[in-house]
A protein has these predicted regions:
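Peptidoglycan-targeting cell-wall enzymes and recognition modules
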Residues: 55-76
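Short, conserved "active-site rim" segments that organize catalytic pockets and cofactor/ligand binding
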Residues: 1-57, 66
């Protein structure tokens, strides 16, 4: 595992009443030419945590900060 020195929290900027899944976000990122979902974890509206990108792979969630960070996004 890489040397993690920060956790970066994002929101999906989706409607709060819309059920959004890891696959929804993955599809959105792939449609924009990314290699996979950019976040390592996604927190659903009910508070459950779901894995996105593997922790063994550098995230794609915050330009200039991806190398040593974990990206977590919450739906909403």
């Amino acid at each position: 595992m890489k040397n993690i020195d920060k956790v970066i929290v994002h929101c999906t900027a989706t409607p709060e009443d819309r059920h959004t899944t890891v696959e929804d976000v993955r599809r959105w990122h792939l449609d924009r030419g990314w290699s996979d979902i950019g976040y390592h974890f996604l927190v659903y509206l009910d508070g459950t945590v779901h894995e996105g990108r593997s922790l063994d792979v550098q995230g794609a969630h915050c330009r200039g900060q991806n190398k040593n960070s974990i990206g977590i996004a919450y739906v909403g």
